[in-house]
């Protein structure tokens, strides 16, 4: 109770079961800035992977991954700005909130695309290349139908989609980069604690954003290091 009283201005009460948490103005600002500052690095990083690509398939994969990475931070930032400054526009805010949830599914699919597209897979495992996008489409339909109604189910879908391709990736003969992939996944999982702690921990959602940024950086590093050319080769190519 003493903790809550001390930090009351930085945190509102918990949201009801089927409702949304209402951040304080401080939390709104933190939610915006923690992802807004990552938009430019995401764009630059995506362009670098495209520049390092050796063939058309690597370029396509770089674009898929880059678009998912950039879309995550851009859509998240726009939604939190609208939620903060234009919350009276209920329909607009609701649409952007749905987009914010839907883009997570496609970001997960895009994050696995380099591993599924550029590594040799077995005949059964190769089906995950398209199945993960089918899962993303299913998640999008779920958001349209049941947005904010069954939050635990939504979280279960995110975690299932995050872990299912990992089972395929870990079965590859070439295991380079899998430690980084697992490390990033662990960071995401730890961040979920804060994702579900609005109204319990001040700035919980902004802290979740930092976990997302850290995990995404770890995964980007693994993709850059193990699936695309080394920086020395890049400099030599220039």
From Swiss-Prot:
<keyword id="KW-1133">Transmembrane helix</keyword>
<feature type="transmembrane region" description="Helical">
    <location>
        <begin position="199"/>
        <end position="219"/>
    </location>
</feature>
<feature type="topological domain" description="Cytoplasmic">
    <location>
        <begin position="83"/>
        <end position="101"/>
    </location>
</feature>
<feature type="transmembrane region" description="Helical">
    <location>
        <begin position="175"/>
        <end position="195"/>
    </location>
</feature>
<feature type="transmembrane region" description="Helical">
    <location>
        <begin position="152"/>
        <end position="172"/>
    </location>
</feature>
<keyword id="KW-0472">Membrane</keyword>
<feature type="transmembrane region" description="Helical">
    <location>
        <begin position="102"/>
        <end position="122"/>
    </location>
</feature>
<dbReference type="GO" id="GO:0045666">
    <property type="term" value="P:positive regulation of neuron differentiation"/>
</dbReference>
<dbReference type="Pfam" id="PF03006">
    <property type="entry name" value="HlyIII"/>
</dbReference>
<feature type="topological domain" description="Lumenal">
    <location>
        <begin position="220"/>
        <end position="238"/>
    </location>
</feature>
<dbReference type="GO" id="GO:0005794">
    <property type="term" value="C:Golgi apparatus"/>
</dbReference>
<feature type="topological domain" description="Lumenal">
    <location>
        <begin position="173"/>
        <end position="174"/>
    </location>
</feature>
<dbReference type="GO" id="GO:0004672">
    <property type="term" value="F:protein kinase activity"/>
</dbReference>
<dbReference type="InterPro" id="IPR005744">
    <property type="entry name" value="Hy-lIII"/>
</dbReference>
<keyword id="KW-0675">Receptor</keyword>
<feature type="topological domain" description="Cytoplasmic">
    <location>
        <begin position="196"/>
        <end position="198"/>
    </location>
</feature>
<dbReference type="GO" id="GO:0031902">
    <property type="term" value="C:late endosome membrane"/>
</dbReference>
<feature type="transmembrane region" description="Helical">
    <location>
        <begin position="124"/>
        <end position="144"/>
    </location>
</feature>
<feature type="topological domain" description="Lumenal">
    <location>
        <begin position="50"/>
        <end position="61"/>
    </location>
</feature>
<dbReference type="InterPro" id="IPR004254">
    <property type="entry name" value="AdipoR/HlyIII-related"/>
</dbReference>
<keyword id="KW-0458">Lysosome</keyword>
<feature type="topological domain" description="Cytoplasmic">
    <location>
        <begin position="145"/>
        <end position="151"/>
    </location>
</feature>
<dbReference type="GO" id="GO:0005765">
    <property type="term" value="C:lysosomal membrane"/>
</dbReference>
<feature type="topological domain" description="Lumenal">
    <location>
        <position position="123"/>
    </location>
</feature>
<dbReference type="GO" id="GO:0032880">
    <property type="term" value="P:regulation of protein localization"/>
</dbReference>
<feature type="topological domain" description="Cytoplasmic">
    <location>
        <begin position="1"/>
        <end position="28"/>
    </location>
</feature>
<keyword id="KW-0812">Transmembrane</keyword>
<protein>
    <recommendedName>
        <fullName>Monocyte to macrophage differentiation factor</fullName>
    </recommendedName>
</protein>
<feature type="transmembrane region" description="Helical">
    <location>
        <begin position="29"/>
        <end position="49"/>
    </location>
</feature>
<feature type="transmembrane region" description="Helical">
    <location>
        <begin position="62"/>
        <end position="82"/>
    </location>
</feature>
<dbReference type="GO" id="GO:0140911">
    <property type="term" value="F:pore-forming activity"/>
</dbReference>
<comment type="similarity">
    <text>Belongs to the ADIPOR family.</text>
</comment>
<keyword id="KW-0967">Endosome</keyword>
<comment type="function">
    <text>Involved in the dynamics of lysosomal membranes associated with microglial activation following brain lesion.</text>
</comment>
């Amino acid at each position: 109770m003493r903790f809550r009283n001390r930090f009351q201005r930085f945190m509102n009460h918990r949201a009801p079961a089927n409702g949304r948490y209402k951040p304080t103005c401080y939390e709104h600002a933190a939610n915006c800035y923690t992802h807004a500052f990552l938009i430019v690095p995401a764009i630059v990083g995506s362009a670098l992977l495209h520049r390092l690509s050796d063939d058309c398939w690597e370029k396509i994969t770089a674009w898929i991954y880059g678009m998912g990475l950039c879309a995550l931070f851009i859509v998240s930032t726009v939604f939190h700005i609208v939620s903060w400054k234009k919350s009276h526009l209920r329909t607009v805010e609701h649409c952007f909130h749905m987009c914010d949830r839907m883009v997570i599914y496609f970001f997960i699919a895009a994050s696995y695309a380099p591993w599924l597209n550029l590594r040799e897979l077995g005949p059964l495992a190769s089906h995950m290349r398209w199945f993960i996008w089918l899962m993303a489409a299913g998640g999008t339909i779920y958001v349209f139908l049941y947005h904010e109604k069954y939050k635990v189910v939504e979280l279960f879908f995110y975690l299932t989609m995050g872990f299912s391709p990992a089972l395929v990736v870990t079965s590859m003969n070439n295991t380079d980069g899998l430690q980084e992939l697992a490390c990033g996944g662990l960071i995401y999982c730890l961040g979920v604690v804060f994702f579900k702690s609005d109204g319990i921990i001040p700035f919980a959602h902004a802290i979740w954003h930092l976990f997302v940024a850290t995990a995404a950086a770890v995964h980007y590093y693994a993709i850059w290091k193990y699936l695309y050319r080394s920086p020395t080769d890049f400099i030599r190519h220039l």
